[in-house]
Amino acid sequence: MKKYLLNIFLFAATGLTISSCTEAKLSSESVIKPEEKKQTPFDKWLQVNYVEPYNIEFIWRYDDKETDHNYYNIPADYNAAIKLAHIVKYTCIEAYDRVAGINFTRQYFPKMLYATGEFEYNNNNTMILGTAEGGKKIYLAGTNNLDKFLGSIDDLNTFYLKTIHHEFMHILNQTKPYDTAYDLITGTTYLSDDWSTSTGASGYLKRGYISAYSQKEGREDIAEILSTYVTNPKSWWDAKMTEAGTEGATLIQKKLDIVRSYMKTEWNVDIDELRDEILRRENNIINGSVSLTDLSIN
């Protein structure tokens, strides 16, 4: 009896539904509404300082489509993202403006910067600070840790700024390939993913590498040479060459010579001038002479 009554109810309901569908007029307006994001003062500042002069999108809200789901991550903090956007513009984008010209920056600097809250950790005791994708995007991790590193140029470079120069070098290399002779300088001693093991973690200078990560492969090596060179003073570099010894320093110098020639010949960028400009601007960040929170629009 209960089953019968249930069937009657379903039949009646179905009939009612069919009847109502045939009589109702469907609206042409979609019921799926895109999420409306309220414009913040930061968004307006980004429009004037990133989008309008450079056509660069600085994404600070969590974007599921842009996030690598192989790693745990969280959204960037609003105030930390404001500071990071100021730092990137002042120390990186405007440094290239000054040395290479604003048209260079407009044409080649990636059109998307995506900032997330946490660094990405691998199971080999390493972490990802940033990545470059397709010559168009730089992914910046660890935004919410920024305040911990603002008091030190070394920390700021290690966790943020060196990464940007490293990834930008990848983008330049994707646009105009570097001399393949570079990969042969230490071609037999690259370690692939073993660069992070105890074998790769020490003695890399004497083997002709400026960092442990340089040992991964040629394209990472050349990006490390450029990014390390322009974010450290000459005294630091000279000390590393002394530590590398005659053989290691000779190999690193050969790599630096190719980088210097590549940047000047292909991009008309003097890497010594670029280094001076970057370091000057980084010092201004550390000594507080540049506001990292000002969202006023001129």
Whereabouts are the PLM-identified features?
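Second-shell loop/turn segments in exported
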Residues: N70-Y78, D147-F159, G208-K216, G245
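Active-site recognition of the HExxH zinc-binding catalytic motif
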Residues: D154, T158-D179, A223
